[in-house]
């Protein structure tokens, strides 16, 4: 069998005396789709936040393509090819679609921000995935459905 693209081994996450994840194992192979199901408070978001670098496991290992990695922050996850569509939107309302998608990964031209390149990138990924959206629209002016598209495009960028 081929190497899993993502493996979470014996993940434990504690917050003080409360154990949110207790020995969780998850293996994902290329092309698979998984659903993480459970009641409110079951630890689903906590588990995914560890995979995305928003939280550090108390113990356990995360492997990407067979290599153990440490997720210190979301940038580490993104660099490892992991994106996350958040349950609660992580968008800055007064910013444009483009500004929200490239936030933290802004293209530069010398020391200046290259918003033309950023906008072009947003148009390209939205067309590639069939998620058309106005790259210049402000988040506060678009529907919740369009905001969800922005979250998806952020994960795909």
Residue ranges and their predicted role:
Residues 1-157:
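Glycine-rich phosphate-binding loops of nucleotide-dependent enzymes
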């Amino acid at each position: 069998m081929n190497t899993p693209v993502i493996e979470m081994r014996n993940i434990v996450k504690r917050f003080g005396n409360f154990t949110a994840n207790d020995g969780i194992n998850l293996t994902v192979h290329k092309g698979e789709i998984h659903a993480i199901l459970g009641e409110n408070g079951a630890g689903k978001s906590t588990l995914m936040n560890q995979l995305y670098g928003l939280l550090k496991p108390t113990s356990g290992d995360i492997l990407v393509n067979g290599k153990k990695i440490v997720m210190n922050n979301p940038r580490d996850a993104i660099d490892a090819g992991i994106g996350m569509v958040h349950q609660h939107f992580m968008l800055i309302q007064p910013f444009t679609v483009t500004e929200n998608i490239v936030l933290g990964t802004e293209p530069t031209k010398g020391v200046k921000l290259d918003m033309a390149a950023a906008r072009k990138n947003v148009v390209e990924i939205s067309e590639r995935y069939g998620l058309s959206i106005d790259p210049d629209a402000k988040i506060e002016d678009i529907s919740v459905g369009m905001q969800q598209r922005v979250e998806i495009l952020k994960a795909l960028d």
